[in-house]
Amino acid sequence: MGDRVTERVLSDDASPWFMEHAARYRLAAGYVAGRSVLDVACGTGFGAARLMDAGATRVIGLDIAWDALTTASRLGLRDVGLCRADALSLPVADESVDVVTSFETIEHLRDGQAFIAEVRRVVNQTHGIVILSTPNAYATQPVDNVPKNPYHVREYYPEELTSLLAEHFPSVELKGQVVSRDYGYCPYWVTPASPASTVRQRLSGIGWKLERRLLPDSWKDSVSRLIHRRAFYPSDTDFVFDSSAVEVGHVTVAICKMQG
């Protein structure tokens, strides 16, 4: 297929991207109580377990990578089913799940249209909900539509994502993922090309990267609280999802419903 699927978010809260990823599952948790869930590209399964804890009746996690599923099985995830599967050929019956989640997946696939059609096939056609996320091309700024991330095949501008999803779902709502005003900004998202960054933020981002490289892990939080007055890494609750931040959010989240 020419897809690039080896990029992985591990279940390691020392990673700067872990809590950002976990925040999406926190958002999805508000939609799963009393419902069956399919988590496509579940990785190590930490998010699938969180959805189960949020009251889902059943959660199945699918991923193409054996190493991720092996890690997931070692974690002993309670009541979460795991299966190796291709996102373009889901081993699930038509209309068999209430909610589909799939975070940071579509940018790895050459045929995004086929992926969305497959997701729509398996979700309940009357009350189904699909929650997806993908990097915002306004933030990542691919050159001539070629992503800078070597694992990404295509990155979507919000209007492109809306157009694609609207072909399959009567209701599509986009939200930009940003850090809360209380936290300030997320330094590892600040790059010289970032449209939302100021000179001060860029300089702080450079300083943060130096601190990350040079400071022992045991010092990072203390030094960050002293200098920046916040934890070194944002927690999942430091991220918010705002419909007014679609163009500036580093990540776009789409909430698609079969009922308008």
Which residues fall in each region the model found?
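A short His-aromatic
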Residues: 104-108
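Conserved N-terminal segment of class I S-adenosyl-L-methionine
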Residues: 1-93, 99, 103, 113-116, ...
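Substrate-binding/catalytic lobe of Class I Rossmann-like enzymes that use SAM or dcSAM, i.e.
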Residues: 167-199
